[in-house]
């Protein structure tokens, strides 16, 4: 793990949480290392933390700090070398009619309702399916970096023009875009909204002439997290170094 003294973060303090049940691997406990105080974690500092394996959830900046497990691997896609698979090309074509709008952070009831429906359909019984408005806003609408909402609606040629289908939260950083969270209309089981959102973010990163799309943690043995290795070429932060990660 990257040594904290190597980071230009002398004003920050870091602490380890108490163990808690792992959300991704059964019968495992997890711990996190948290960076504080949050008001000092502006864009430049967060960019350094991101490259050291940290992520943020609202104003909470953390990285895995488990005692006997290194399953969580921070990932980033090499944007200029990305080569879509056949299924990814199909997803891009299928949802090409969606209209994406980039918005400033702000509460919209329509977004919150889609978030609730997504959690109830995709993650029922989890920690987030009962989030109230305050929890939703703390999780997704609080940020001290350059963050945006991307909403995707059915286009004018669709039978339901303007219908909200998906929302993504992204951070615009020095070396790329960091994909924070995406939720979508999970009632359409034939859709590939999640894949499309990643492909859209890749295109935006390329247009900004930035090298990386940060996708969060890859966990090989977790169905919820292993899909990320489908986006190649990808690098993972392993033994303090960014190196090729194929997922095989």
UniProtKB/Swiss-Prot annotation:
Protein's GO biological process: ubiquitin-dependent protein catabolic process via the N-end rule pathway
Localization (cell): Cytoplasm
Superkingdom: Bacteria
One GO location term (cellular component): cytoplasm
Keywords annotated in UniProt: Acyltransferase, Cytoplasm, Transferase
Pfam families for the chain: ATE_C (PF04377), ATE_N (PF04376)
The UniProt record lists the keyword Transferase: yes
Reactions catalysed: N-terminal L-glutamyl-[protein] + L-leucyl-tRNA(Leu) = N-terminal L-leucyl-L-glutamyl-[protein] + tRNA(Leu) + H(+); N-terminal L-aspartyl-[protein] + L-leucyl-tRNA(Leu) = N-terminal L-leucyl-L-aspartyl-[protein] + tRNA(Leu) + H(+)
EC number, as in UniProt: 2.3.2.29
Gene Ontology terms for molecular function: arginyl-tRNA--protein transferase activity; leucyl-tRNA--protein transferase activity
Family in the record: Belongs to the R-transferase family. Bpt subfamily.
Cited function: Functions in the N-end rule pathway of protein degradation where it conjugates Leu from its aminoacyl-tRNA to the N-termini of proteins containing an N-terminal aspartate or glutamate.
Name under which the protein is recorded: Aspartate/glutamate leucyltransferase
Organism per entry: Polynucleobacter asymbioticus (strain DSM 18221 / CIP 109841 / QLW-P1DMWA-1)
Primary gene name: bpt
């Amino acid at each position: 793990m990257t040594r904290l003294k190597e980071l230009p973060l002398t004003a920050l303090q870091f602490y380890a949480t108490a163990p808690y049940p792992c959300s991704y691997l059964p019968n495992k406990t997890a711990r996190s290392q948290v960076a504080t105080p949050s008001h000092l974690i502006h864009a430049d500092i967060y960019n350094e933390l991101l490259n050291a394996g940290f992520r943020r959830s609202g104003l909470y900046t953390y990285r895995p700090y488990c005692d006997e497990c290194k399953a969580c691997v921070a990932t980033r896609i090499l944007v200029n070398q990305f080569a879509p698979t056949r299924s990814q090309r199909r997803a891009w074509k299928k949802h090409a009619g969606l209209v994406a709008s980039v918005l400033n952070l702000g509460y919209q009831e329509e977004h919150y309702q889609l978030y609730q429906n997504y959690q109830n359909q995709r993650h029922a019984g989890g920690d987030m399916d009962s989030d109230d408005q305050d929890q939703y806003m703390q999780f997704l609408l609080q940020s001290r970096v350059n963050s945006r909402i991307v909403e995707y609606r059915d286009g004018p040629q669709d039978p339901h023009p303007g219908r909200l289908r998906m929302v993504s939260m992204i951070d615009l950083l020095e070396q790329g875009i960091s994909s924070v969270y995406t939720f979508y209309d999970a009632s359409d089981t034939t859709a590939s909204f999640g894949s499309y959102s990643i492909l859209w973010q890749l295109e935006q990163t390329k247009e900004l002439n930035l090298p990386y799309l940060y996708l969060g943690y890859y966990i090989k043995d977790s169905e919820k997290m292993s899909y990320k290795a489908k986006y190649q070429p990808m690098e993972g932060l392993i033994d303090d170094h960014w190196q090729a990660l194929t997922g095989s």
